[in-house]
Amino acid sequence: RAAELAPVPYTQPTTDAVVALREHATQTQTQVRKDVTRYRYGQEAHLDETLERLGLSPNDTQRPVLSGLHEEQRDGAYTLVLEFDSPFIEFDKWQEKQPKIEAFFGPGITAEVSQEADKKVAVAMKAVVA
């Protein structure tokens, strides 16, 4: 039996206004949101391959864990925020990878990394409003 990976929980409710903005989300934002909020099979962790490609996963035990997500409106744009527990990867490493994160999840988004709490990092992907 393949490993079962539970959906990542929303950490705050999505408002109707933000739901309305989903139509402006990029294909990648929509795909990431749908992938991490459903059961997955045969995967070690949510976004494990992505974190590896971004150089943020030295090994399985030190890989950051996607612990939650939420959707919001930033500057009038749809924004998907991924929340990671990152006890082994320092925040400055996340900041250093920000351009790579933006390129990986782009085009059509800007990426912002922020430290939410000790060892917690948020990656906000904001859709570029044309």
Task: List each model region and its residues.
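N-terminal topogenic membrane-targeting module
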Residues: 1-70
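Cytosol-/stroma-facing membrane-proximal "stalk/adaptor" domains immediately downstream
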Residues: 67-130
